[in-house]
Amino acid sequence: MFANARAKRRSRASSPTPARLGGYAPLRVEITEEQRQDINEAFKLFDSDKDNAIDYHELRAAMRALGFNAEKSEVLKILRDFDKTGKGYLQMEDFVRVMTEKIVERDPLEEIKRAFELFDDDETGKISLRNLRRVAKELNENIDDQELEAMIEEFDLDQDGEINEQEFIAIMMDEA
């Protein structure tokens, strides 16, 4: 799982795809093809009536699906700024612009810390064998305990049998 995450990060970093942003003056920003697909899939998933436009509730749900906990005021501002019809809808191209900008603005360290919290569901501040087992099961990964223990051992710098947040950050930043 950790090795896959590092490999995935490397492949993302090495294969950016340009995206155009901004209201009337497009900016050139780099996102990966996978990120672009995630944005498109989120839009299509939450465009419940398939009219190529999403309303407030659909926009908020799509943003959450992409990992953004948007407040009501932020969602309303996006609709005000990008709704060309004045009917409270966001077109797909504008959704792609907004989400691309938000993805580019993400703080990688905050994203890693959020990922750590997903592993550390018991809030101990560490990723245990039990935590890894649960995540592997949720991801439908068939990894036996011996392999999971080897993963912990490889990255457990303080040799306490678990991965703490700093060790996890080092793994994800490729410093381990």
Curated annotation (Swiss-Prot):
<keyword id="KW-0539">Nucleus</keyword>
<feature type="domain" description="EF-hand 1">
    <location>
        <begin position="34"/>
        <end position="69"/>
    </location>
</feature>
<feature type="binding site">
    <location>
        <position position="51"/>
    </location>
    <ligand>
        <name>Ca(2+) 1</name>
    </ligand>
</feature>
<dbReference type="GO" id="GO:0005509">
    <property type="term" value="F:calcium ion binding"/>
</dbReference>
<feature type="domain" description="EF-hand 4">
    <location>
        <begin position="143"/>
        <end position="176"/>
    </location>
</feature>
<dbReference type="InterPro" id="IPR018247">
    <property type="entry name" value="EF_Hand_1_Ca_BS"/>
</dbReference>
<comment type="function">
    <text>Required for the proper coordination between exit from mitosis and the initiation of septation. Has a role in bipolar spindle formation during spindle pole body (SPB) duplication. Required for the localization of sad1 to the SPB.</text>
</comment>
<feature type="binding site">
    <location>
        <position position="156"/>
    </location>
    <ligand>
        <name>Ca(2+) 2</name>
    </ligand>
</feature>
<feature type="binding site">
    <location>
        <position position="167"/>
    </location>
    <ligand>
        <name>Ca(2+) 2</name>
    </ligand>
</feature>
<feature type="binding site">
    <location>
        <position position="158"/>
    </location>
    <ligand>
        <name>Ca(2+) 2</name>
    </ligand>
</feature>
<feature type="binding site">
    <location>
        <position position="160"/>
    </location>
    <ligand>
        <name>Ca(2+) 2</name>
    </ligand>
</feature>
<comment type="similarity">
    <text>Belongs to the centrin family.</text>
</comment>
<dbReference type="InterPro" id="IPR011992">
    <property type="entry name" value="EF-hand-dom_pair"/>
</dbReference>
<dbReference type="GO" id="GO:0005634">
    <property type="term" value="C:nucleus"/>
</dbReference>
<dbReference type="GO" id="GO:0005829">
    <property type="term" value="C:cytosol"/>
</dbReference>
<feature type="domain" description="EF-hand 2">
    <location>
        <begin position="70"/>
        <end position="105"/>
    </location>
</feature>
<dbReference type="GO" id="GO:0061496">
    <property type="term" value="C:half bridge of mitotic spindle pole body"/>
</dbReference>
<dbReference type="GO" id="GO:0005825">
    <property type="term" value="C:half bridge of spindle pole body"/>
</dbReference>
<feature type="binding site">
    <location>
        <position position="162"/>
    </location>
    <ligand>
        <name>Ca(2+) 2</name>
    </ligand>
</feature>
<dbReference type="GO" id="GO:0035974">
    <property type="term" value="C:meiotic spindle pole body"/>
</dbReference>
<keyword id="KW-0131">Cell cycle</keyword>
<feature type="domain" description="EF-hand 3">
    <location>
        <begin position="107"/>
        <end position="142"/>
    </location>
</feature>
<keyword id="KW-0479">Metal-binding</keyword>
<feature type="compositionally biased region" description="Basic residues">
    <location>
        <begin position="1"/>
        <end position="12"/>
    </location>
</feature>
<feature type="binding site">
    <location>
        <position position="58"/>
    </location>
    <ligand>
        <name>Ca(2+) 1</name>
    </ligand>
</feature>
<protein>
    <recommendedName>
        <fullName>Cell division control protein 31</fullName>
    </recommendedName>
</protein>
<dbReference type="GO" id="GO:0043161">
    <property type="term" value="P:proteasome-mediated ubiquitin-dependent protein catabolic process"/>
</dbReference>
<dbReference type="GO" id="GO:0044732">
    <property type="term" value="C:mitotic spindle pole body"/>
</dbReference>
<dbReference type="InterPro" id="IPR002048">
    <property type="entry name" value="EF_hand_dom"/>
</dbReference>
<dbReference type="GO" id="GO:1990395">
    <property type="term" value="P:meiotic spindle pole body organization"/>
</dbReference>
<feature type="region of interest" description="Disordered">
    <location>
        <begin position="1"/>
        <end position="21"/>
    </location>
</feature>
<comment type="subunit">
    <text>Component of the spindle pole body (SPB), acting as the connector of microtubule arrays in the cytoplasm and the nucleoplasm, is involved in nuclear positioning before chromosome segregation, SPB separation, spindle formation, chromosome segregation, nuclear migration into the bud, nuclear reorientation after cytokinesis and nuclear fusion during conjugation. The SPB half-bridge, which is tightly associated with the cytoplasmic side of the nuclear envelope and the SPB, is playing a key role as the starting structure for and in the initiation of SPB duplication in G1.</text>
</comment>
<dbReference type="GO" id="GO:1903087">
    <property type="term" value="P:mitotic spindle pole body duplication"/>
</dbReference>
<keyword id="KW-0106">Calcium</keyword>
<dbReference type="GO" id="GO:0030474">
    <property type="term" value="P:spindle pole body duplication"/>
</dbReference>
<keyword id="KW-0677">Repeat</keyword>
<dbReference type="GO" id="GO:0000226">
    <property type="term" value="P:microtubule cytoskeleton organization"/>
</dbReference>
<dbReference type="GO" id="GO:0008017">
    <property type="term" value="F:microtubule binding"/>
</dbReference>
<feature type="binding site">
    <location>
        <position position="49"/>
    </location>
    <ligand>
        <name>Ca(2+) 1</name>
    </ligand>
</feature>
<feature type="binding site">
    <location>
        <position position="47"/>
    </location>
    <ligand>
        <name>Ca(2+) 1</name>
    </ligand>
</feature>
<keyword id="KW-0132">Cell division</keyword>
<dbReference type="GO" id="GO:0051301">
    <property type="term" value="P:cell division"/>
</dbReference>
